[in-house]
Amino acid sequence: MSAFEKPQIIAHIQKGFNYTVFDCKWVPCSAKFVTMGNFARGTGVIQLYEIQHGDLKLLREIEKAKPIKCGTFGATSLQQRYLATGDFGGNLHIWNLEAPEMPVYSVKGHKEIINAIDGIGGLGIGEGAPEIVTGSRDGTVKVWDPRQKDDPVANMEPVQGENKRDCWTVAFGNAYNQEERVVCAGYDNGDIKLFDLRNMALRWETNIKNGVCSLEFDRKDISMNKLVATSLEGKFHVFDMRTQHPTKGFASVSEKAHKSTVWQVRHLPQNRELFLTAGGAGGLHLWKYEYPIQRSKKDSEGIEMGVAGSVSLLQNVTLSTQPISSLDWSPDKRGLCVCSSFDQTVRVLIVTKLNKI
């Protein structure tokens, strides 16, 4: 691929903020996005922005008691577009951004900070009931049904006497029919655990040696295909989730991507083989996954095992001197993306030529 054919990552708009931004998410079916974080005075903030004539217009600012760590629209309908958030106090809230004074749903979900959140069953993505998953420093991963108050529908926690590990990232997947659904969770010690929500059982676990910063399936609403896990020390792993070997688990390929922590991974909504990784030195890398000729083979005992593919770097750019802490592709406009970094700047990016790859 020549330099002219390569995708380019262009910083379209950048805006400095007066608070630390932990997460940013596009509002579905709009040119708007929300940013979440905390003011220096210790309170939480949600801001709603719209792109207008190449600039950002602040539509709404909502201040809350506790700093807000993460958010998702994944469990809401396209009509309501409610935002679910996790905060430093362990609270899960669902907000109507049109009337944000009181949450439409509120539960003290965890004893400590909610580090990560994901949603499924909303926005027409994923079969089955809408659900939210939260992962916390208290070591637990909980699944919530927004229609059911107070109690989680599933609670994955260490058995008594086992060390509680800090859960840093959670992701839904495999929601291709009404029954099937999995949650994948990554922890500070490098553990990755795959929970089967239909059978309420641990389906698979592995350890990638370094703390797991971000996990994402290439698609939530199909039979599990690929899972990307990013970690401290600049590495990420791509697991082929189609074939599970009874002892070897899933085949994987790893790549040393950045010279520092890989904070985030996000797959392009319009092409599941492309994904962006965001690094601790302020860099973004755009990758393409190539499948092997055969995705499975038989081992010496005749049991099917997966075969990993390869990843190639399409483009990289350094946007900041600080870590890029959050990243979100627009579900509606191919190549449009928003990211936030710890230099208190939010950037709207355009990635070109993605339809040519």
Curated annotation (Swiss-Prot):
Pfam families cross-referenced by the UniProt entry: WD40
Ranges for the WD repeats: 63-105, 115-154, 162-205, 207-249, 257-297, 319-357
Keywords assigned: Apoptosis, Cytoplasm, Repeat, WD repeat
MF terms in GO: ubiquitin binding
Lineage: superkingdom: Eukaryota
Primary localization class, coarse: other
Gene3D superfamilies reported in the protein's UniProt record: YVTN repeat-like/Quinoprotein amine dehydrogenase
Record GO cellular component, one term: RPAP3/R2TP/prefoldin-like complex
Tissue expr: Widely expressed with the highest expression in testis.
Subcellular location: Dynein axonemal particle
Purpose of the protein: Key assembly factor specifically required for the stability of axonemal dynein heavy chains in cytoplasm.
Subunit structure: Component of the PAQosome complex which is responsible for the biogenesis of several protein complexes and which consists of R2TP complex members RUVBL1, RUVBL2, RPAP3 and PIH1D1, URI complex members PFDN2, PFDN6, PDRG1, UXT and URI1 as well as ASDURF, POLR2E and DNAAF10/WDR92. Interacts with PIH1D1; the interaction associates DNAAF10 with the R2TP complex. Interacts with several dynein axonemal assembly factors.
PANTHER family documented for this protein: MRNA EXPORT FACTOR AND BUB3 (PTHR10971)
Designated name of the protein: Dynein axonemal assembly factor 10
